[in-house]
């Protein structure tokens, strides 16, 4: 009798704890994708770009190259896609292909996400913050 009672009690405990709750789980917001950010000093390779963008702080970077020639070729590809790229020469010696610049970090981040969505081949687009001298 004790064994039967113990078995029934054990079955009830296991059955009660294994049932899933029918409560709705709270909806969690989708996490914003990571956007790599780098802060560095750089110079504009064209005077016209410097004049038009010198007051901006946040730059959307679609490519980074050790060779200026490679950066120029990539810029041509970006022009064919409808962008107006600028080449920035970083303090580390890399030629950064920037397609937009902004005063606001939020606007720059939005643009990075938009590019990633519209141009999946450029999902590695990132954000460069101009370091003050």
Go through each PLM region and give its residues.
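Positively charged n-region of N-terminal signal peptides that target proteins for export
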Residues: 1-4
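Long, polar low-complexity intrinsically disordered regions
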Residues: 6, 21-26
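Sec-dependent N-terminal signal peptides
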Residues: 6-13
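C-terminal motif of bacterial Sec signal peptides marking the signal peptidase cleavage site
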Residues: 15-18
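Post-signal peptide N-terminal segment of mature Sec-exported envelope proteins
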Residues: 24-54
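Extracytoplasmic
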Residues: 42-48, 55, 66-133
